Amino acid sequence: MERFDELLRGMDLEFFGRGSHKISIEKALDLHSRGEAFILDIRSEKENRLISLGFAASIPANEIPDRLEEIPHGVTIAILCTSSVRASVVYAYMLLKGYEKARVMAEGLKDIAGTIKPGYVRKYKMKPKEDLK
């Protein structure tokens, strides 16, 4: 709990003002296309069945502690969910677990879907889920 206290103390106005805890969908997909990011969809399995994102690895938030070994170190971890509430919780958890490049996806699912259009997909050559492992 002491580590969480320290983490929280560092999240002051300056921290949030810099925005370094966030990443845009455009930046995340750019890094992902170069193998420099792991896009982590933390929505529930049921939510993922309704709307699946082929470029993201799906690990529900409540399963993260048991599946942490599936998440690589050394690359940016772009955490996404329907909004940023769950992503923010997982972000803090990931930082405490040593994932210094964890980031919260700035956009919600609605905005992400609006970004991914044919020209965008072609430009960034998104990798399908099978290539994420």
Question: Where are the model-predicted features located?
Answer:
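Rhodanese-like catalytic fold shared by cysteine-dependent sulfurtransferases
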Residues: 1-38, 45-76, 85-133
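Short, surface-exposed ligand- or partner-binding patches at beta-edge/loop junctions that are enriched
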Residues: 79-80
